[in-house]
């Protein structure tokens, strides 16, 4: 019986070693293409004061391909991502750019502390961990868009008003710099 147990354990060890030594394959992520026209998706986002999802509004011209530019626009303090996306449709068609407008809601990111200031400090003045700050949400938004679109064209990050303050601080205070152009207005 001891011989059978030894053989069984040897076989299990051999299989485990073989599996461990095999080349690792990247986990394939499901790419959910963004349809032409207006659309929306929501992602799980751990920053902010609750577990609410963070919604992204899109406008994709019919002739847009992954080789064309992506324009990610952060709204002002009015928190109107969907309206920004609608307002940028003409620009999208003229420049053949995919428009992405995240909506950082007041409920999830209350006040300037969580939006313009990026959630860097808590109410007691303590510095939050980098992954807890709103700026890390911007990095994940860019990553989500790149994954969904397989974008190879320029990635433009734009902020208007409060969004301009947010993007400006993101660029200065540790954003991943995984974009090609950063532009801010009226901040």
Indicate residue ranges for each PLM-predicted region.
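A domain-start/cap signature at the N-terminus of enzymes
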Residues: 12-70, 82-83, 94, 123-126, ...
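Membrane-penetrating hydrophobic segments
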Residues: 1-11
């Amino acid at each position: 019986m001891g011989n059978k147990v030894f053989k069984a354990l040897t076989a299990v060890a051999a299989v485990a070693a073989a599996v461990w030594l095999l080349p690792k394959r990247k986990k394939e992520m499901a790419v959910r293409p963004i349809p032409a026209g207006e659309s929306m998706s929501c992602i799980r986002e751990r920053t902010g004061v609750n577990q609410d999802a963070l919604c992204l509004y899109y406008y994709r011209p019919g002739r847009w391909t992954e080789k064309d530019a992506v324009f990610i626009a952060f709204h002002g303090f009015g928190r109107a991502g969907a309206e920004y996306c609608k307002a940028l449709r003409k620009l999208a068609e003229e420049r053949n750019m995919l428009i992405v407008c995240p909506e950082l809601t007041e409920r999830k990111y209350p006040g300037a502390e969580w939006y313009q200031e990026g959630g860097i400090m808590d109410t007691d003045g303590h510095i939050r961990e980098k992954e807890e700050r709103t700026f890390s949400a911007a990095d994940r938004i860019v990553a989500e868009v790149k994954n969904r679109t397989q974008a190879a064209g320029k990635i433009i990050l734009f902020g208007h008003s409060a969004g301009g303050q947010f993007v400006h601080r993101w660029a200065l205070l540790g954003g991943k710099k995984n974009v090609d152009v950063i532009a801010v207005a009226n901040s």
